[in-house]
C-alpha cells in the first residue's frame, strides 16, 4: 500500500461490484432477512450494475471503477458481431495499465438489462504509447435465456457497443444490428419491465417463477430438531434465549464494543446442533 500511495507503483485494479450510496438502494433490500423460512430473490436479473443502470439509481462507485496516476484516451472503435477493436493511448506522464471494458446495450426498454459486460482487456502502456487491441465478445453476447425453449437464444435488435473505463464512464459507442429471435419473456410487464424491482408484487414474482410462493413463516406447530435454528425457539426457553442474547448485545454496546454487539445477530440463524460444537462441552448431544 505504501508503494501505491507514494507513486512507486501505479494502481490498475477495477471494482468487480457496484458500491451503492445507501443500503436501501440495494435491489434486494425490501426482502432480505424479512422472512423466516424463505429467501426471496424477487430482483431476478437486476443484480449489481444491471439494476442500478436500469432503474437509474445513482451509485457511490460504479462497477469497473478504478484509479490511476495516468490517463488514457480511447479512439478508432471498430465493431463486428464477434469483437470490438480500438486504440488506447496513455496520455499521462507515467506508465500505467488500463482495463478496457466492452458493454453491449440497447434502448428497447423490455425485461432485460440496458447494458451488460461482454468482454474486457488489460493493456500496459508507457507515457505517450498507443496500442491497438481487440476484445472478443462473450459466448452469450446478444443472447437471452428463453424459458420456453430452455436454452439461450440470440435476440434480434439494434445494439450499442459501449467501450469504457467503467460501467458509467463510457468513452466510445457504435451501433450494430443483430438478427435473431424475440423471446416472449422479454415482453413481461410491470416492475420487471421498468427495473423498479423494489415494487415487485408476490403475484408478479409467482408469475415469473411459474409456481406459488411457499409460506415465508415457520410452521408454529412443527417440533424443533437439531437442524432448527435458534430463532425458532418458542415458549419459556425461547423467551429466556431472546432476553439473554439481547442483554449481551446491549452490554457490549454500553462498553463501546459495537462490532462485537453486531456479532450477536449471527446467533439467530445458527442451528441447535452448532451449540454442541461451540460450547466447549457445556452442551452435550443428550441435552439437545
Language-model features and meaning:
Residues 1-97, 103, 156, 160-163:
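Secreted, periplasmic, or luminal enzymes acting at the cell surface/secretory milieu
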Residues 81-85, 130-134, 171-173:
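Intrinsic-disorder/low-complexity, polar/charged segments enriched in Ser/Thr/Lys/Arg/Asp/Glu/Gln
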Residues 139-186:
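Terminal connector regions
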Residues 174-243:
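Charged, amphipathic alpha-helical linkers/stalks
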Residues 256-288:
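C-terminal non-catalytic accessory extensions
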Amino acid at each position: 500500500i505504501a508503494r501505491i500511495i507514494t507513486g512507486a507503483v501505479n494502481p490498475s485494479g477495477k471494482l468487480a461490484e457496484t458500491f451503492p450510496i445507501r443500503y436501501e438502494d440495494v435491489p434486494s433490500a425490501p426482502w432480505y432477512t424479512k422472512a423466516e423460512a424463505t429467501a426471496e430473490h424477487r430482483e431476478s436479473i437486476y443484480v449489481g450494475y444491471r439494476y442500478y443502470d436500469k432503474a437509474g439509481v445513482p451509485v457511490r462507485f460504479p462497477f469497473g471503477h478504478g484509479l490511476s496516476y495516468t490517463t488514457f484516451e480511447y479512439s478508432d472503435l471498430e465493431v463486428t458481431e464477434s469483437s470490438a477493436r480500438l486504440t488506447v493511448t496513455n496520455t499521462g506522464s507515467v506508465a500505467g495499465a488500463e482495463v478496457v471494458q466492452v458493454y453491449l446495450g440497447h434502448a428497447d426498454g423490455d425485461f432485460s438489462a440496458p447494458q451488460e459486460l461482454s468482454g474486457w482487456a488489460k493493456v500496459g502502456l508507457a507515457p505517450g504509447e498507443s496500442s491497438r487491441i481487440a476484445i472478443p465478445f462473450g459466448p452469450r453476447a446478444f443472447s437471452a435465456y428463453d424459458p420456453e425453449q430452455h436454452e439461450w437464444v440470440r435476440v434480434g435488435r439494434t445494439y450499442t457497443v459501449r467501450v469504457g473505463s467503467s460501467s458509467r464512464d463510457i468513452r466510445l459507442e457504435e451501433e450494430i444490428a443483430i438478427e435473431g429471435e424475440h423471446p416472449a419473456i422479454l415482453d413481461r410487464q410491470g416492475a420487471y419491465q421498468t427495473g423498479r424491482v423494489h415494487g415487485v408484487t408476490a403475484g408478479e414474482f409467482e408469475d415469473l417463477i411459474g409456481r406459488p410462493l411457499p409460506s415465508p413463516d415457520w410452521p408454529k406447530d412443527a417440533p424443533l430438531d437439531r437442524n432448527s435454528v435458534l430463532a425458532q425457539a418458542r415458549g419459556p426457553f425461547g423467551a429466556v434465549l431472546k432476553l439473554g442474547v439481547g442483554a449481551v448485545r446491549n452490554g457490549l454496546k454500553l462498553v463501546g464494543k459495537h462490532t462485537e454487539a453486531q456479532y450477536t445477530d449471527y446467533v439467530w440463524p445458527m442451528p441447535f446442533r452448532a451449540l454442541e460444537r461451540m460450547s466447549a462441552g457445556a452442551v452435550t448431544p443428550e441435552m439437545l
